[in-house]
């Protein structure tokens, strides 16, 4: 199966089928037939439906990343994330019905939910990068998971937002990002407090050891 044209056909076929049927009912033979490829060719490129979904999400990532405005660098981290994530909702717009079907299926299928969470977390790492926020290491993973939670909560609003300007989605996204910003600030304050306590405890511990040694008592 040639790339990337045929892969695009498979992705579009999956999203079309998900819009027409419950996602649980979409089978690999149905997908191959809709995409106009053989089942063997489908297997050559994908492990299953979730892999095709991951390809769709990757395409959305690429579209959002390609459209990032350099002027965003002048805005606050929250404002940059708002712009990036809202662009992401706009990129998803043609497939809203399909996404609704997938979300419903994930609520019934914990395995699907876990696989999607992994894919979305990776995607959110790229969205953080697009907003100029580090997504590497343990802190980066924490940020990506947190942003994934924000994304999931706002998506519930977006799926039912019929306003052309997505006013409810914008309001929900702004609210959730402000909440996340407060959590990050609280965590940073806690980290500073712990570091200060650690530094102040070291001299006291050293003094205790010196006193014990002077008295001939091992610690």
Regions found by a protein language model. Name each.
Residues 13-17, 91:
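Short amphipathic alpha-helical elements of helix-turn-helix/winged-helix folds
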Residues 57-64, 72:
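Short, basic, alpha-helical segments at the C-terminal edge of helix-turn-helix-like DNA-binding modules
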Residues 133-138, 157-167:
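Inter-helical turn/loop segments and adjacent helix faces that build the functional surface
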Residues 160-219:
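C-terminal peripheral helix-coil segments that are non-catalytic and often amphipathic
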Residues 9, 17-55, 59:
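Helix-turn-helix
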Residues 1-10:
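Short, Lys/Arg-enriched anionic-surface-contact patches
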Residues 110-133, 141-155, 171:
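Amphipathic alpha-helical packing segments from all-alpha helical-bundle domains
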Residues 69-101, 108, 118-119:
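Hydrophobic alpha-helical connector segments
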């Amino acid at each position: 199966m040639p790339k990337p044209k045929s892969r695009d056909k498979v992705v579009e076929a999956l999203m079309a089928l998900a819009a027409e049927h419950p996602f649980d009912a979409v089978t690999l033979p149905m997908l191959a037939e809709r995409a106009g490829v053989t089942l063997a060719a489908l297997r050559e490129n994908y492990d299953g439906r979730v892999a095709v979904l991951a390809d769709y999400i990757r395409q959305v990532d690429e579209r959002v990343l390609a459209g990032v405005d350099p002027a965003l660098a002048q805005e606050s981290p929250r404002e940059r994330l708002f712009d990036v994530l809202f662009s992401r909702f706009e990129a998803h717009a043609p497939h809203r019905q399909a996404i609704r079907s997938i979300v419903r299926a994930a609520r019934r299928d914990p395995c699907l939910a876990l696989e999607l969470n992994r894919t979305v977390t990776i995607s959110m790492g790229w969205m953080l990068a697009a907003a100029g926020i580090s997504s590497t290491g343990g802190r980066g993973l924490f940020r990506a998971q947190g942003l994934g939670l924000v994304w999931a909560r706002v998506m519930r609003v977006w799926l039912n937002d019929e306003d052309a300007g997505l006013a409810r989605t914008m309001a929900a996204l702004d609210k959730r990002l402000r909440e996340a910003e407060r959590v990050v600030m609280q965590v940073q304050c806690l980290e500073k407090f712990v570091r200060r306590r650690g530094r102040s405890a070291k001299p006291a511990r050293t003094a205790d050891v010196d006193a014990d040694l002077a008295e001939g008592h091992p610690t």
